């Protein structure tokens, strides 16, 4: 009984990961479940949203540069 049980357990231990890798590497499954879900959670950015974000980053960068420049001019 013990040897048969160990053989069964080892079969399960080896079969489960192989089956999971086989299922996960199916192109159709990946497209249906992963890519589609990703698009639902994080939709593609709109051009005007991206442009606003870039403008905001540029304003913040300029403010930091001006602050550093003022600090450098006032320093020793």
From Swiss-Prot:
Its main location: membrane. It is found in: Membrane; Mitochondrion; Mitochondrion inner membrane. It is a single-pass membrane protein. Keywords: Membrane, Mitochondrion, Mitochondrion inner membrane, Transit peptide, Transmembrane, Transmembrane helix. GO terms for cellular component: mitochondrial inner membrane. The chain crosses the membrane at residues 7-24. GO terms for biological process: mitochondrial cytochrome c oxidase assembly. The keyword Transit peptide applies. It comes from the Eukaryota. One of its GO terms (molecular function) is unfolded protein binding. Belongs to the PET100 family. Plays a role in mitochondrial complex IV assembly. Interacts with COX7A2. PANTHER family: PROTEIN PET100 HOMOLOG, MITOCHONDRIAL. This is Protein PET100 homolog, mitochondrial. It comes from Bos taurus. The lineage of its organism: Eukaryota, Metazoa, Chordata, Craniata, Vertebrata.
